[in-house]
Curated annotation (Swiss-Prot):
Residues 21-122 form the C-type lectin domain. Keywords: Lectin. This is Putative C-type lectin protein FPV003/FPV258. SUPFAM superfamilies: C-type lectin-like. One of its GO terms (molecular function) is carbohydrate binding. It comes from the Viruses. InterPro entries: C-type_lectin-like/link_sf, CTDL_fold.
Length: 123
């Protein structure tokens, strides 16, 4: 009986620690992440549109913050699934007026917010 209780408790702990991501999000590196490179030019989004898309897709979704993805493992994931394209993210520092942050999975940069790119969301 004690062993059954122990097994049940271990299973509950395992389930509590596993990350269940919803919709287009993929569980990676203890995060739910969605890389949307939007191949077709007319499907790419401005920074504001990308931010809204993350929020509308799931209420807890936001553009990925640079401080959360600025590590080798996450950047390789973004580079692989983003195929080297520019993708909108949020930066922890306030960029100059009219500029927004992006990454291609290798570097970070700033571009006019009305440029159209894919995006990286985290839920």
């Amino acid at each position: 009986m004690k062993s059954l209780i122990l097994i049940a408790m271990l299973l509950m702990l395992d389930c509590a620690n596993s990350l269940n991501c919803r919709g287009p999000y993929t569980s990676y590196n203890n995060k739910c992440i969605w890389v949307n490179r939007l191949d077709k030019m007319h499907h790419k989004k401005t920074y504001s549109e990308a931010s809204t898309t993350c929020l509308i897709t799931f209420p807890m979704g936001t553009l990925a913050r640079r401080s959360l993805i600025d590590n080798e493992k996450d950047m390789k994931f973004i580079s692989k699934f983003g195929m080297g394209q520019s993708l909108w993210i949020r930066d922890d520092k306030k960029p100059e007026v009219g500029k927004c942050a992006y990454t291609d999975g290798k570097t970070f940069g700033f571009s006019p917010c009305n440029a159209t790119y894919g995006f990286v969301c985290i839920d």
